[in-house]
């Protein structure tokens, strides 16, 4: 994989799954691409919304990436949990199966959406932009 290093300092990214759909390939590929691009990646695995917020706070992450597996309502709960622990300014992106109408709602909330087919290079580039803006 040829993903250039977008980071001058190692930004920290939490990658987590939000559903029990059993598909790990995309999560693993995104985590690897971000590592290859110079990010420190915390692979959280399958976590509840409160756990995602706790890990993000405890690890002082710069960015949160979520595999939503079609369950968009869980992203709303995660955003609420992030606000509750004072991380409402931490950028969030999600991927996986996201219905078009839900993608627009997520974007309105400030969540970046990367549907299936988005290149790993595009995700790494966006992660670099999102962490540089902080």
Language-model regions, residue ranges each:
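Residues within well-formed alpha-helices
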Residues: 30, 55, 125-126
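Cofactor-cradling patches in redox/metallo enzymes
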Residues: 35-112, 116-122
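Two-component system phosphotransfer/interaction surface
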Residues: 119-132
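ATP-dependent carboxylate/acyl-activation modules
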Residues: 2-42, 132-134
């Amino acid at each position: 994989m040829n993903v250039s290093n977008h980071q001058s300092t190692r930004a920290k990214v939490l990658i987590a799954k939000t559903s029990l759909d059993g598909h790990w390939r995309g999560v693993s590929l995104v985590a690897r691409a971000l590592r290859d691009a110079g990010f420190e990646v915390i692979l959280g695995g399958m976590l509840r919304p409160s756990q995602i917020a706790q890990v993000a706070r405890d690890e002082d992450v710069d960015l949160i990436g979520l595999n939503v597996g079609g369950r968009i309502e869980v992203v709303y709960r995660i955003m609420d949990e992030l606000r509750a622990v004072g991380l409402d300014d931490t950028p969030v992106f999600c991927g996986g199966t996201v219905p078009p109408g839900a993608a627009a709602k997520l974007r309105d909330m400030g969540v970046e959406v990367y549907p299936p087919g988005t290149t790993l290079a595009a995700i790494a580039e966006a992660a670099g932009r999102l962490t540089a803006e902080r």
